[in-house]
Amino acid sequence: MNMEIAGHEFFDVDGSTIWYDLQTPRGEVFWLAAATPDGKRRWYHLDRDQWSVHFNISPDGKKFAGDGGDEEMVAHARDGKWIYLFTPRAIPDVAGISAPNADDLVHPGTLQAERLVDMKKHDYRLEPNIIFTRDGKWLIFRSNMHGDVHTYMVEVAKHAN
C-alpha cells in the first residue's frame, strides 16, 4: 500500500515469529502484525489511542503490552498516554466465505486493551520501553512522569484473566 509503514520489530517468545507495528497508511490505520517462518501473517487492529511506540509479548505468548504515545507522535493520539495490556482476539470466519487461498492471506484480529498506568505526565521524548518479567506477572518500564527518570513495575497478573 502506498504510504504504508512498519517498524519497531520484536520477536515472539520462541524467536521464530517477528512482530511489528504496521500502519496502512501511515498515521491512519493501526495494526500489531506478525510474519511467521511458514509465511503466515496475522494482523491485530487497534484504535488510534491504543497505538504504542513499542509493543512486547508475554512469556506465554498470550498477551501483549504497549507503552502508549502522545499527540506529537505518528498516531496523534488524544488519549494514548497509557501503559496497556492487550489480549488478542482472532476474527473467526463464521460466515463460511473464505477465499480459496485463505491460508495465504492475512489472518485478522483485534486487540482488547486494558489501561494499566496513566502516563499523562510522562514526556514521550523518553520512550518507556516496556518488558514483561520472565514469570509474566509484571511489566517493567521507565518513565519521567515524576520528574527524574525512574524504573517502574506494574502488576499484570491481576489484570490478565
Residue positions per predicted region:
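Short strand-connecting beta-turns/loops that link adjacent beta-strands
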Residues: D14, P25-R26, D38, D60, ...
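Flexible loop/turn segments at secondary-structure boundaries
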Residues: G27, M73, D123-Y124, G147-V149
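Loop/turn-rich, solvent-exposed surfaces of beta-rich toroidal or solenoidal domains
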Residues: G27-F30, L46-L111
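Short loop/turn segments that connect beta-strands within beta-propeller blades
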Residues: T36-G39, R89, A157
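Conserved beta-propeller blade repeats
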Residues: M1-D21, R48-M73, K121-L139
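Hydrophobic beta-strand positions in blades of beta-propellers and related beta-sheet-rich domains
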Residues: E9, F30-A34, K81-L85, I130, ...
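A short beta-strand motif characteristic of beta-propeller blades
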Residues: M1, R41-L46, R115-M119
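Blade-level signature of beta-propeller repeat domains, shared across WD40, Kelch, NHL, RCC1
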Residues: L126-N161
